[in-house]
Amino acid sequence: RDLHLSIRRQRQMCIRDRREVAALFNDLIAEPLATSGDDASRDKEVASGLSFSGLSQMSLVELGYQHAEESWAAVADFLDSTWVAALQPEGRRRLEAFLPLLCEMAGATREPDSALTRSLPFVRAVCRRSAYLVLLQENPRALRHLLTLVASSIWLSERLAARPELVDELLHESTLYSAPSRDELHALVRQQLLRIPEEDLEAQMSALSRIKDGVILRVAASELTGTLPIMKVSDNLTFLAEVMIEQALAVARAELVQRYGEPQSDRAGFAVIAYGKLGGLELSYGSDLDLVFVFDGADGETAGPKVMDNTRFYTRLAQRVVHVLSAQTYAGRLYEVDLRLRPDGDSGLVATTLPALRRYQLESAWVWEHQALVRTRVVAGDLALKTSLEALRREVLAMPREQSELASAVCDMRDKMRAEHTASSNRRERFDLKRDPGGIVDIEFVVQYLVLAHAGEHAELTVWSDVIRLLEALERTGLIAANEAKMLSQAYLDYRSATHSLGLQGRAAETDAAEFEAQRQQVKQITEALLPGLQAG
């Protein structure tokens, strides 16, 4: 208690002269404590140890901290917290040994203040599992990795504090700054799930969450150190999501088949279509999964202990896949899942049949739904159904369209998006990388328009779902000049790279308006020429 009162007094005086505060802190810590008996004597020893062999605000100055006053105040707040007060003597002794090393090694990083203050929430998270402190103390290279990463990314520091078990990844330097291949991911998943009983669904879901968190840490570390460019970052995050979806489908299907048996039909099959960022191979760290579930063979029933018609089976399967992907477990959740792009949106069925999807896309879908179809891929499911869905996508994209009506519909949708955005944020001095004129959405809309307008004459426009390769295809077909395609591609990559960097700092995807002004004006000029009226709003 005396220790906490002393530190509270110290924190209140941090606004005074640094030398005076440091000296006063050391004097206060050294005051005798009003305790008695062996336990009290041991507490006194631990409390006295919390002066950390002379560690003070001035020692942070000597270690190279640029904002020693603020950093020392953060340390004082940490020491004055209920977390530290509740520690058992062993945990306090471990903290006593660890914190000076933390301050010293943070001082050796490029950003000592950020490294120290952002690492304290992680230290707090592991205080009651203080073996982690010993682990880091005995593995200084792992501690150095921790400090470097949290100093580089506030998002990553928060993630490590929320999932302190990720410290295990820091011990494996050979893999920390490299992302696993798809085959390695499959092997890792198999290895982890083999240890878990098939009937323990929550344990399987938790294992998948831990695998996902570990891989995301590796991808983020690789991006922060420059070993992965933006497209490779998105590729790896996309591969990770696909493996998780495949595994969620396998787990959910095995559970249902055990109870109801396999669906019986010549055409029986189930598939998962990815839309949006996942469909376009552009997933980022916090992206939702936009999914649509499709099945075929609705006219049969299962052959198992309990009979169920195929429609109910596949609907239940879709629901279970969503559950595995999005339910909260003690290890967290995998992803947020969004099903609103299915036929008829929120009012539509969770899973739709292939014939119903075909009718909807050819007869009822809005232009914006065909725009969304440009960025779709089948990411899991039965091969025969996947082939049928890919053929349907090509057919819909290649439908004959009156270009002026198409252009008007695309521009109207862009105007609606722009109006909604302007209503919520009307700051001329800022540039929303995604939604503002000359940003990401304008590039995506002009690409989608050109695909829908010309896929009937140029089949290669239906092959890819990502913007960069679609721009390359548009250049090859002569629909975009080479210099324009190059400029739009570079702007798109620059915008996305900035979006990722801002996300890793826990910030919204916007910058000062002047930062991308030249690129933004070029994008507006090119997209307006390719799609007259796009910039009119």
Language model features with spans:
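A nucleotide- and high-energy phosphate-metabolite-utilizing enzyme signature
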Residues: 1, 9-537
